[in-house]
Amino acid sequence: MRIGVELNGVLRNTLGKIEQTYQKYMIEKMEGVDDKNSFKYELKLPITSLELSNHLMFENEGDLYSFLYEEFPMEIFGHSQSTEYTTFNDLNEQYVNLRDSHDLLIVSDEIGKSKPSSLFFLSKFGCQLEKIKFYSNSTINSMWNEIDVLLTANPTLLLNHPEDKLVIKYETIYNQEINTIHKIKKIKELEEIIKQIATC
């Protein structure tokens, strides 16, 4: 079986780092500026969805894109924390246990400078998986073609996946309302779920 493990939300706490970076570089930078014509940056917490424009106030979508992928991609995507303290120790151990009978790969929705930043993140944490598949909205079908099972926290992927593919939900605050057959709370639970799926 080919198993895709999503980077954002499953292995990397991307939303936490986005929140921290926005607070530091957008809100704190503008504190004390009394220009009536300047834009008021505002952070609406908690971040309970992947619709970032609902939580991070920018003048327009272009500014949000620039913040994520042009101005701070290494800060956000390269220097994020892992989702759990032992994420990569657990993932690497399961990779070693499963690699003789299953193919594990990292999949991630990335564009522009977030790709090299994500590679830095994976190397920083010592990820041993040999294959990484970057995709975007326009190339998402190529990601689905490479896997049979996807471990994801992304609500869109949990709800909209090809019928011949299985999804495993990694539980987060922004996907708790979505019901799936397979779900985990910790990355170390993945191996047991894969064994259950393989015997079905």
Model regions and ranges:
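Acidic, Mg2+-coordinating phosphoryl-transfer loop and its flanking beta/alpha structural elements
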Residues: 149-186
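Short amphipathic alpha-helix with an adjacent loop that forms part of the alpha/beta core around
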Residues: 141-144, 190-200
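Active-site neighborhood of HAD-like aspartate-dependent phosphohydrolases
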Residues: 1-67
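Short, well-ordered alpha-helix to beta-strand connector turns
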Residues: 101-102, 129-130, 145-148, 164, ...
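Substrate-recognition "cap/lid" segment bordering the active-site pocket of phosphatases
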Residues: 109-160
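Short acidic-hydrophobic, aromatic-tinged amphipathic segments that line or gate anion-handling sites
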Residues: 132-136, 181-189
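Short, acidic loop-to-helix structural element flanking the phosphoryl-transfer center
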Residues: 58-106, 112-116
